[in-house]
Amino acid sequence: RYGSSAASDVYKRQIIDIELLVEKELGEFAIQICDPQRIGTFIPTHSPFKRWEFEIHDDDDIDEFSSDENIKKLLSPWLNPDEYKILRKAIYQFHSVLANEFQKDNCYLIGDAAHQNPPFMGEGMMTGCRDAENLSWKIIMDHKYNLGESLLKNYQIERRDHARFIVENSLGIGLLMEAYAHTENIEDVPAE
């Protein structure tokens, strides 16, 4: 029942993730597309593969939105349909959630059970791996040397602040992208 101790989910967005086979050179930099009509991301994974993500609006019909015809429209500013092959498409929901407690008695939360964040820092999976690494050696040492709870109690102290940093900053980057996409004057976007 740890879910009930989680902080509120202040950032919920759906995106479509589209993986393509593209022979055309598109550069080696990830690009955030701050288009007021539809925010998106371009990620140049290992050649010849490319990844595009586009925000799904609340009033979009998911089936229609994820159709190949609509994907062609989404990609049309950058690619012609004969320049790519769609390999995969998936709908994801991004969250910004941080559990208030990562441990209680002998129950521990790691990874997505403890924290979820938008992907804008690219740290979601690695934050979960750091949780697992931090907790696993403590459990092994406790089991091997019967150290009691003292070592295991440090898990919350050592991991929650780091996870909070990732969640809050990922959220901040997402909100900043939205602010840039929806402003007429860049100087109107707050510095923080």
Roles of regions detected by a PLM:
Residues 4, 22, 26, 59-62, ...:
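Short, polar/flexible loop-turn hinges at active-site or ligand-entry regions and domain interfaces
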Residues 1, 71, 135-136:
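Structural preference for long, well-ordered alpha-helical segments in enzyme cores
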Residues 1-11:
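Single conserved hydrophobic/aromatic residue that forms the stacking wall/gate
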Residues 35-91, 188:
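Conserved FAD/dinucleotide-binding core of flavoprotein oxidoreductases
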Residues 14-41:
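Flavin-dependent oxidoreductases
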Residues 86, 92-172, 179:
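Conserved mid-domain beta->alpha element of the FAD-binding
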Residues 186-192:
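Long, low-complexity segments enriched in small/aliphatic residues
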Residues 8, 30-33, 99:
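Short Gly/Pro-enriched turn/cap motifs at secondary-structure boundaries
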